[in-house]
UniProtKB/Swiss-Prot annotation:
Placement of sequence motif TPR repeat-binding: 721-725
Domain of life: Eukaryota
The protein's name: Heat shock cognate protein HSP 90-beta
Source species taxonomy: Eukaryota, Metazoa, Chordata, Craniata, Vertebrata
Subunit details: Monomer. Homodimer.
């Protein structure tokens, strides 16, 4: 043996690392790997790659496995040295492989890596160990690699990262085939010798590697032995001598009567000695569920996997398990939770929704590029065969492969939603939790807008307590109806009682009630559905199908009320853009509508509530208001008569302002000066109750009001005011 060692030393060759090593080490520590534990992930994934290669070669030449049929990875911590050893039965490396892959940095440097990637190279072949191998130096001060390839002798590579490495023929214990990586740990990194820590890291990063990962731990146990066995143990181990003194006690017990022989033999075996043994435990017994055939997986298995993945205490609502093959290969397992998390739209919170694996190796658990924001509630796993293992976030953003994966995931999510929609009960639960996400998708995702719009559900004027889809709405449309009518507001009750829907409902047309703030953003992008335009009943230009008689009546009303419309515009001045005759009112005297492209009253309310709103936008988006009056309403008709009799009548002016302000409120707008409006109403109440205004003024004359209350113009003519009422 000494000769062999001497012979081995004669064979030692020293090589210099290329200059890039310092830069690469810095790159690994600062860019790719902020946490040291991933060194284990990298070494395990390298071992897995080596096993993949020998398995692939054995498909065409089974004799390749003659040097070892078991394809496995072993982890052996040794606290005495202290070393952590990883052993695989993979393809191994020749001497040339060792020198090239673990010394010629350029091959696995980032620059060469990315250039080769862009040139279409096979990712798994870029460097036998690639960048990840050097992450071993995060925890080790020295690394020894012993390797045996079927086509070469057994070699040992060694380096303390001091600018050089050595390669020699290894005459130590033969490993058959494969690679053994021995890490001589730094003093402050001995935590990786602990059974608990190794298990934790393997479970986190390499739980779904396709080969068994076995942890070998030396443990002590108490063994019960008979007297004779104890003697043998004593001879074998000198440290057992101290226990000889206990033997007479056992023999004394043995001097009992014959009927107690059974007990005697039991007590003989109560002698306990400590023995050391190697405990083996497979750490990745849970095979990747997503790599299995979906037909072979039960709902219970999906449920267990979902809970282990998400820590959710409830079962998932729906699952989609699929694989994509062809130019690009990946598998995915996607889950819809039963309920939305309370912080679903909290942008600054790091989301751990979809875990990204590359060839069963965990890469990251918060990959924003993998799924659009509106699908941020989807949980699951994506396992790619094509992405490089050491991919950084910067590279992910540029990756064309990831863009294709993302497109497929979105497509499959929409398929899952459509399938779920067939089960009304479950879809109702889904919609209650995630309707905002679908509407956000309509706002953001123009490509899938049509498919998303088919998933929307709303209450309508004809749906009662149930919600209905836009497809069902279209199927119920009248022959003469060309548009889908909708109204936005705060609640179902508010919009159902709105003045805007009066005429539309009376004519038998269905109105969609949109009561979530995000609906306003949604309909800005959703201009049509199934060839039918979406028309807001609160905006100008509402056209309802009319027959000839209705058109004639409308023209007559316009001519009849033209003078009143002009007068009201003069009185209200810049408060409104125009005053017109309405075709949408039945029982209300008037309403305020907005221009086609401006904000609705509901949108204006939402924007005013934004703490960080842009006031410059508010100026032009708070659309010009149009006052529409109902020619069939007695208030409007009486007002027209008064205006025709005397257009300078102060009571007319005051009533016009009061009507306008009341219409603002009923149409969903807020008043700029609610106090003035309130004072007008109080005065009307006093007039209705017959309270003399002069008496009230006399009583209150001693108290100086903070502001002068605008007088109710023409209030001296009480009888005329009452007549209008």
């Amino acid at each position: 043996m000494p000769e062999q060692v001497q012979h081995g030393e004669d064979e030692v060759e020293t090589f210099a690392f290329q200059a890039e090593i310092a830069q690469l080490m810095s790159l690994i520590i600062n860019t790719f790997y902020s946490n040291k534990e991933i060194f284990l992930r990298e070494l395990i994934s390298n071992a897995s790659d080596a096993l993949d290669k020998i398995r692939y070669e054995s498909l065409t030449d089974p004799s390749k496995l003659d040097t070892g049929k078991d394809l496995k990875i072993d982890i052996v911590p040794n606290p005495r040295d202290p070393t952590l050893t990883l052993l695989d039965t993979g393809i191994g490396m020749t001497k040339a492989d060792l020198v090239n892959n673990l010394g010629t940095i350029a091959k696995s440097g980032t620059k060469a890596f990315m250039e080769a990637l862009q040139a279409g190279a096979d990712i798994s072949m870029i460097g036998q160990f690639g960048v990840g191998f050097y992450s071993a130096y995060l925890v080790a001060e020295k690394v020894v690699v012993i390797t045996k390839h079927n086509d070469d002798e057994q070699y040992a590579w060694e380096s303390s990262a001091g600018g050089s490495f050595t390669v020699r023929t290894d005459h130590g214990e033969p490993i058959g085939r494969g690679t053994k990586v021995i890490l001589y740990l730094k003093e402050d990194q001995t935590e990786y010798l602990e059974e608990r820590r190794v298990k934790e890291v393997v479970k986190k990063h390499s739980q779904f590697i396709g080969y068994p990962i076995t942890l070998y731990v030396e443990k002590e146990r108490e063994k019960e032995v008979s007297d004779d066995e104890a003697e043998e143990e004593k001879v074998e181990k000198e440290e057992e001598e101290s226990k000889d003194e206990e033997k007479p006690k056992i023999e004394d017990v043995g001097s009992d009567e014959e009927e107690e022989e059974g007990e005697k033999s039991k007590k003989k075996k109560t002698k306990k000695i400590k023995e050391k043994y190697i405990d083996q435990e497979e750490l990745n017994k849970t095979k990747p569920i997503w790599t299995r055939n979906p037909d072979d997986i039960t709902q219970e298995e999906y449920g267990e996997f979902y809970k282990s993945l998400t820590n959710d205490w409830e079962d998932h609502l729906a699952v989609k398990h699929f694989s994509v093959e062809g130019q690009l290969e990946f598998r995915a397992l996607l889950f819809i939770p039963r309920r939305a998390p309370f912080d679903l739209f909290e942008n600054k919170k790091k989301k751990n929704n979809i875990k990204l694996y590359v060839r069963r190796v965990f890469i990251m658990d918060s990959c924003d590029e993998l799924i659009p924001e509106y699908l941020n509630f989807i949980r699951g796993v994506v396992d790619s065969e094509d992405l490089p293992l050491n991919i950084s976030r910067e590279m992910l953003q540029q990756s064309k492969i990831l863009k294709v994966i993302r497109k497929n995931i979105v497509k499959k999510c929409l398929e899952l939603f459509t399938e779920l929609a067939e089960d009304k009960e479950n879809y109702k639960k889904f919609y209650e939790a995630f309707s905002k996400n679908l509407k956000l998708g309509i706002h953001e995702d123009s490509t899938n807008r049509k498919r998303l719009s088919e998933l929307l559900r709303y209450h309508t004027s004809q749906s009662g307590d149930e919600m209905t889809s836009l497809s069902e709405y279209v199927s119920r449309m009248k022959e003469s109806q060309k548009s889908i009518y909708y109204i936005t507001g705060e609640s179902k009750e508010q919009v159902a009682n709105s003045a805007f829907v009066e005429r539309v409902r009376k004519r038998g047309f269905e109105v969609v009630y949109m009561t979530e703030p995000i609906d306003e953003y949604c309909v800005q992008q959703l201009k049509e559905f199934d060839g039918k335009t979406l028309v807001s009943v609160t905006k100008e230009g509402l056209e309802l199908p009319e027959d000839e008689e209705e058109k004639k009546n409308m023209e007559e009303s316009k001519a009849k009320f033209e003078t009143l419309c002009k007068l009201m515009k003069e009185i209200l001045d810049k408060k409104v853009e125009k005053v017109t005759i309405s075709n949408r009112l039945v029982s209300s005297p008037c309403c305020i509508v907005t221009s086609t492209y401006g904000w609705t009253a509901n949108m204006e309310r939402i924007m005013k509530a934004q703490a960080l709103r842009d006031n410059s936008t508010m100026g032009y988006m708070m659309a010009k208001k149009h006052l529409e009056i109902n020619p069939d309403h007695p208030i409007v008709e009486t007002l027209r008569q008064k205006a025709d009799a005397n257009k300078n009548d102060k009571a007319v002016k005051d009533l016009v302002v009061l009507l306008f302000e009341t219409a603002l409120l009923s149409s969903g707008f807020s008043l700029e000066d609610p106090q003035t409006h309130s004072n007008r109403i109080y005065r009307m109440i006093k007039l209705g109750l017959g309270i003399d205004e002069d008496e009230v003024i006399a009583e209150e004359s001693s108290i100086a009001p903070p502001d002068e209350i605008p007088p109710l113009e023409g209030d001296e003519d009480t009888s005329r005011m009452e007549e209008v009422d």
